[in-house]
Amino acid sequence: MIERIIDTEVIKDLFFKYKEKYNPIINDYTFILSYKIDNKYVAFLIYQLLYEKAEVIDIFVLEEYRRKGIGKALLEEMMKDKTIESITLEVKESNKNAILLYNSLGFKEVAKRKGYYNGVDALLMLKEVK
């Protein structure tokens, strides 16, 4: 089941172990979609929305739930937001499975960021939604 988390206290509790990473980005422009199975959070997608432009900050699926369409379902749910006209994201150039997923959803590579992930290059990808 996909749900939008809007209570900032729930967000902070949910991501407590990632506090240092995510606290600086939790604001009025941050949205989180979560995926629950048997009342357990197994995946989330964090994005920021400024006017009609969305940026995926992170997408995470617990390892035992990967390659089951959950990440795709979260991205498709995000794309249903009628206010979003374009979506950008960064992905490690070596993360071939993620790149295949993003390509299957219509994302295109628009730039490369040298050394973005601790010396590993990232691809900047874009999808026009409208």
Language-model features: locations:
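Conserved glycine-rich acetyl-CoA-binding loop
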Residues: I59-E76, K92-L100, S104-L105
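Acetyl-CoA-dependent GNAT
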Residues: M1-E64, L75-E77, D81
